[in-house]
């Protein structure tokens, strides 16, 4: 009786082990394809971040935008630029941060348009 119980447990462990390794291989393959898909855009975005000195997330926070829509970015940019004007008691430092954030988001929109329309790069 104990012999059969041990065989059943052993077979169960083998089945679970095979299923786990199969699932792990599938996950690695999916992760690899996702990384390759993000590869080019991610590299360009990182290069732009290092050149502009401001990250994409920081630029979104400064201009208070969640989606990259030119109208919303422009509207928030104009408002924050006027509010931080030195003539009305604003801060030149904050005003320059607003300008850098808009430049960074404009660059990100350009990168996204290139990756979504690769045929137009010729």
From Swiss-Prot:
Subcellular location: Mitochondrion inner membrane
GO biological process, alphabetically ordered: protein import into mitochondrial matrix
Chief location: mitochondrion
Pfam families reported for this sequence: Pam16
InterPro entries, sorted: J_dom_sf (IPR036869), Tim16 (IPR005341)
Keyword Protein transport: yes
Topological type in the membrane: Peripheral membrane protein
Domain of life of the organism encoding this protein: Eukaryota
Entry keyword Plastid: no
Region (J-like): 58-110
UniProt free text on domains: The J-like region, although related to the J domain does not have co-chaperone activity.
Function: Probable component of the PAM complex, a complex required for the translocation of transit peptide-containing proteins from the inner membrane into the mitochondrial matrix in an ATP-dependent manner. May be required to regulate the ATP-dependent activity.
Quaternary data: Probable component of the PAM complex at least composed of 1 mitochondrial HSP70 protein, 1 GRPE, 1 TIMM44, 1 TIMM16/PAM16 and 1 TIMM14.
Record family assignment: Belongs to the TIM16/PAM16 family.
The protein, known as: Mitochondrial import inner membrane translocase subunit tim16-B
């Amino acid at each position: 009786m104990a012999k059969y119980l041990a065989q059943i447990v052993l077979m169960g462990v083998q089945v679970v082990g095979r299923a786990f390794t199969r699932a792990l291989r599938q996950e690695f393959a999916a992760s690899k394809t996702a990384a390759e898909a993000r590869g080019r855009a991610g590299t360009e975005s990182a290069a732009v971040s290092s050149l502009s000195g401001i990250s994409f997330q920081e630029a979104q926070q400064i201009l208070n935008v969640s989606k990259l829509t030119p109208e919303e970015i422009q509207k928030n940019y104009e408002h924050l630029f006027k509010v931080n004007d030195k003539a009305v008691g604003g801060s030149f430092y904050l005003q320059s941060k607003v300008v850098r954030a808009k430049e960074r988001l404009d660059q990100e929109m350009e990168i996204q348009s290139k990756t979504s329309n690769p045929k137009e790069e010729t």
